[in-house]
Swiss-Prot record:
It holds the Pfam family Bac_DNA_binding. It comes from Bradyrhizobium sp. (strain BTAi1 / ATCC BAA-1182). Residues 96-119 are annotated as: Disordered. NCBIfam families: himA, PRK00285.1. GO terms for cellular component: cytosol. Belongs to the bacterial histone-like protein family. This is Integration host factor subunit alpha.
Length: 119
C-alpha cells in the first residue's frame, strides 16, 4: 500500500492485514470491519477517537447559517448539523512530509498481539 495517488479501499486494508498479520482473509475482513464499526459507533455517540501517533477523529456541531447559491447569488439557509473532523498527529504530519518524527508509528503487530485477550 505504498505510492502516490492511489486510493486505499477496505479491500486493500483487509489484504494488508492478511499479508502482515497472518489472519485468514475472512478474519482479516472481519477485523477491519470491526475496527471501522467501533470508530463509527464512537463518533455517532459524539466521542472523540484518538489514535496515538496517528490522529483524532471528532464530531463538531455547526450552527445554522446563511449561505449563497453560487449560480444565482440568492441567500439560502443552511441547517445546523454535525460534521466529522480528522486532526492528524504531529508524527503523522512529519511522516507525510518526509520527515522522521521523534515518535514511532508501529503498524507491525503480530497475530499474537492482536489476538491476545485484554487484561
Amino acid at each position: 500500500m505504498t505510492g502516490t495517488g492511489k486510493t486505499v479501499t477496505r479491500v486493500d486494508l483487509c489484504e494488508a492485514v492478511y499479508q502482515k498479520v497472518g489472519l485468514s482473509r475472512t478474519e482479516s475482513s472481519a477485523f477491519v470491519e470491526l475496527v471501522l464499526k467501533e470508530i463509527t459507533d464512537c463518533l455517532e455517540r459524539g466521542e472523540t477517537v484518538k489514535l496515538s501517533s496517528f490522529g483524532s477523529f471528532m464530531v463538531r456541531k455547526k450552527g445554522q447559517r446563511i449561505g449563497r447559491n453560487p449560480k444565482t447569488g440568492t441567500e439560502v439557509p443552511i441547517s445546523p448539523r454535525r460534521v466529522m473532523v480528522f486532526k492528524p498527529s504531529a508524527i503523522l504530519k512529519q511522516r507525510i512530509n518526509g520527515q522522521q518524527g521523534s515518535g514511532k508509528m508501529n503498524g507491525e503487530a503480530s497475530h499474537e498481539q492482536l489476538s491476545a485477550e485484554p487484561e
